[in-house]
């Protein structure tokens, strides 16, 4: 027996002695007697989404929403025209993921008017409408004329 084999044999003997002292542990299967079934835990893989599901994070990361893509097209229905005449409010289709502050700043920059408030409405067809109420010093009819609605 050379020195390497001797050290291997000693290590093997020590491990065997350790196991003999500790005892071999056999886990007995527990018998469940309850009526409720607990679904076994399965492997949960780490998620790697293609894009963020939160609106603000998505818009900040991509940064593709400029003023022209936030405010899309004006609405020229009778209801929208009545709002324009009576309440000094313009109605526009806007980007689905845009927020009220984004709509307000984009509208002010595009048309050089002051906006008092913005109300939004998600339609059944999947579009988003913005009811943009102009400030008292701005007139919606003048703006509509300038855009070419009237």
From Swiss-Prot:
InterPro entries: Nucleotide-bd_a/b_plait_sf, Ribosomal_uL23-like, Ribosomal_uL23/eL15/eS24_sf, Ribosomal_uL23_CS, Ribosomal_uL23_N
Organism: Tetrahymena thermophila (strain SB210)
Chain coiled-coil ranges: none
Protein name as catalogued: Large ribosomal subunit protein uL23
Keywords annotated in UniProt: Ribonucleoprotein, Ribosomal protein, RNA-binding, rRNA-binding
Pfam families: Ribosomal_L23 (PF00276), Ribosomal_L23eN (PF03939)
Biased composition range(s): Low complexity: 7-18
GO molecular function, one term: structural constituent of ribosome
Gene3D superfamilies noted in UniProt: 3.30.70.330
